Amino acid sequence: MSDSAPVSGPDTEARELLEALVLTPSVAPDETACADVLVSFFEENDRTAFIDEVGNVRAPADDSVLYTSHIDTVPGEIPVRIEDGENGPELWGRGSVDAKGPLTALAIAAVRTGVSFVGVVGEEVDSRGARYLVADRDAPDAVVNGEPSGWDGITLGYRGIVSGRYICTSESGHTSRPEPNAIQEAIAWWSAVEERFGSNSPGEEENEETGPSVFERVTPKPVRIEGGISDDGLAVETTLDVQLRVPPSYTTDDVRELADGELTAGTVNWTDAIEPTMQSPRTPIARAFRVAIRGQGGDPRLLRKTGTADMNIYADAWDCPMVTYGPGDSDLDHAPNEHLELRELDRAVAVLEAVAEDLT
């Protein structure tokens, strides 16, 4: 077990790598330039690294634990700069929090401790990097997925997601007719779905004042709708794109079946599904993080996130313990004021080094 001393000063190497990565745009699917920066960092530190068929940066080594985070970011230009913040210097720029801060911390710790590393692509769009990775290699002994949790936070759970497209067609007619048209059918189906999932999920916690937590609920969201008279004027057509977030008390099949059960007209083409995950806080890797965070003077926080991450894909494919961890405030994900406190980065690197030393 590592007895790491609390960080006493800036981690210059980590801060320089973070700035280099944030200065290099990597909006999916154009991550190549940033991947090259990452490969160069590993090679400069005498580690073998390569870019695989889909664009992931692979640096295989000790598989006692795999450190992985994503290279890509969402769009949005934020001038890269360092500002003095309330808690010291902050690096501003797109991706500084989501997820080049975690990516940097994991890469630095992987080089210093000799554990395996992968920087994946496409997390913000289709998780093509993570999907390829689980198909291309065996499970490691443990996984740390990099996303912002705060240097003292450990994320154990994510909801899954189901995506689909509702399609309905009805005969055209005068709007005074009482029969529902395709647009009304779409509205009726979606209203029924929202009502269906307004009640508690099986086994979810109930609070008399606030009800079940968001993490424990299915949350349906319409994301796009189109409707109107067809080009030939003979029909009313509607398409409705939807997403439903899935808590661990459901499977994605459960949610699809329940949503399909509310259909009275039209059909749903389900296009994607990612299962939820809830990891145990009692695994060796979770314990190693608690010890390492306390070693840096922190009070470990165990987190559950209402979104979905690449850890969902790893958990569905690999039978090994895992957590998600990384510096940064996740409230700044995708935000116009995205920035990372650099002392967060320093502490996260120290935590990750201690975890790797504990597990190897």
Roles of regions detected by a PLM:
Residues 104-163, 167:
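Acidic/histidine-rich catalytic neighborhood of metal-dependent amide-processing enzymes
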Residues 2-99, 329:
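Acidic/His- and Gly-rich active-site-bordering loop/insert found
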Residues 43-47, 53-55, 60-65, 110-116, ...:
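Short glycine/proline-enriched coil/turn segments at helix->beta-strand junctions
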Residues 92-104, 123-124, 180-183, 339-346:
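Short, conserved micro-motifs enriched in small and acidic residues
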Residues 20, 132, 313-316:
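Well-formed, non-transmembrane alpha-helical positions, independent of function
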Residues 85-89, 109-120, 139, 195-202, ...:
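Phosphate-handling active-site elements
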